[in-house]
């Protein structure tokens, strides 16, 4: 199953997970040192939702991110779907 948002196009990003040791300077230590880093992925907060479309007069079952859900609350589903279609998501 795809981990890409149907409305915003958000997808997993790549980054690093850092292994840290030492005592922080705030606690009067010498500071934190990075002893290693491993590759990891940051996933968007995805969920499957059934949303009512007034334009199509039916429910749409979409796999969307939490950010897209806030966008739907703000602008309305039909406007967000139109924007996604124009951008090609």
Swiss-Prot record:
GO terms for molecular function: structural constituent of ribosome. The keyword Ribosomal protein applies. Keywords: Ribonucleoprotein, Ribosomal protein. It comes from the Bacteria. One of its GO terms (biological process) is translation. One of its GO terms (cellular component) is ribonucleoprotein complex. Pfam families: Ribosomal_L28 (PF00830). The keyword Ribosomal protein applies. SUPFAM superfamilies: L28p-like. Belongs to the bacterial ribosomal protein bL28 family. NCBIfam families: L28. This is Large ribosomal subunit protein bL28. The gene is rpmB.
């Amino acid at each position: 199953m795809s981990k890409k948002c149907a409305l915003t196009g958000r997808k997993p990003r790549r980054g690093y997970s850092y292994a840290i040791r030492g005592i922080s300077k705030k606690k009067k230590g010498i500071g934190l040192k990075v002893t290693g880093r491993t590759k990891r992925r940051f996933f968007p907060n995805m969920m499957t939702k059934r949303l009512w479309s007034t334009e199509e007069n039916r429910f749409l079952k979409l796999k969307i991110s939490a950010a897209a859900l806030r966008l739907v609350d703000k602008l309305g589903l039909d406007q967000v779907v139109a924007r996604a279609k124009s951008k090609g998501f």
